[in-house]
Amino acid sequence: MTCQTYNLFVLSVIMIYYGHTASSLNLVQLQDDIDKLKADFNSSHSDVADGGPIIVEKLKNWTERNEKRIILSQIVSMYLEMLENTDKSKPHIKHISEELYTLKNNLPDGVKKVKDIMDLAKLPMNDLRIQRKAANELFSILQKLVDPPSFKRKRSQSQRRCNC
């Protein structure tokens, strides 16, 4: 219960964050709906503040716009999962869910990207077969780290030529 109630605050932050970019969001209505959702979860309970934020804190580590879109995609999915376990007949829950689905459709598939990261973390790097494959791929990985994408290279070359 504590996780869910504190997550409602983060839901507010996400809705407001995307409200600046998605003009179709009615933030006043969403704030009212989120307040009703907070009441449903009794989020004014004292245990909500115990341990500090659980999701907002994670956003601090993701600084670039595309990175944030990946993590926000995961967070939106979490809220949709949380709302699946609530009374969907309530209009405020239905409205929040609809808005979250709309936001989710405008975000990259963060689940796939997170799965890729988890798969990499699980690779048994002491396995000889994995080591062989990794050694075979090392140079191309290093090239991707060193070589800037062509559009950045072209932009930096044109900036160097300009003597303005």
Swiss-Prot record:
Signal peptide extent: 1-19
PANTHER family per the UniProt record, alphabetical: INTERFERON GAMMA (PTHR11419:SF0)
The organism of origin for this protein: Gallus gallus
GO molecular function, one term: type II interferon receptor binding
Function: Produced by lymphocytes activated by specific antigens or mitogens. IFN-gamma, in addition to having antiviral activity, has important immunoregulatory functions. It is a potent activator of macrophages, it has antiproliferative effects on transformed cells and it can potentiate the antiviral and antitumor effects of the type I interferons.
Protein's name according to its UniProt entry: Interferon gamma
UniProt xrefs under InterPro entries: 4_helix_cytokine-like_core (IPR009079), Interferon_gamma (IPR002069)
Disulfide linkage: none
SUPFAM superfamilies linked: 4-helical cytokines
Family membership: Belongs to the type II (or gamma) interferon family.
GO terms under cellular component: extracellular space
One of the protein's GO biological processes: positive regulation of inflammatory response
Protein localization: Secreted
Main location: secreted
Key words, A-Z: Antiviral defense, Cytokine, Glycoprotein, Growth regulation, Secreted, Signal
Sugar attachment sites: 42, 61
Assembly notes: Homodimer.
Keyword Glycoprotein: yes
One Pfam short name: IFN-gamma
